[in-house]
């Protein structure tokens, strides 16, 4: 059986969340703008996520920058990484990948 009960999303006082749809169980300590975040996504301090769709369990490490990215389930974006796609051609990261 699937578990559909997650803790509420945590938005750090230093975190930013604008014009985004955020599911339960997320931890947002960085900046999230114009995004869709599925359950259990973590955005660490200093990370910037803009115009992205991040599926369940994705982790964006400290000081990473994502723009126009679609990340499948359980993706890890390493500390300080930059991934920038275009609105017409987003960067797509496969399930369980570490970038």
Indicate where each model-derived feature is located.
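Left-handed beta-helix
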Residues: 1-99
């Amino acid at each position: 059986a699937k578990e559909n009960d997650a803790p509420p999303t945590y938005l750090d006082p230093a975190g930013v969340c604008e014009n985004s749809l955020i599911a339960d169980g997320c931890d947002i300590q960085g900046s999230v703008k114009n995004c869709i975040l599925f359950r259990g996504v973590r955005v660490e301090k200093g990370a910037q996520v803009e115009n992205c769709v991040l599926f369940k369990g994705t982790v964006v490490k400290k000081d990473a920058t994502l723009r126009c990215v679609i990340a499948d389930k359980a993706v890890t974006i390493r500390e300080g990484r930059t991934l920038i796609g275009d609105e017409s051609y987003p960067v797509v990261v496969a399930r369980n990948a570490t970038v």
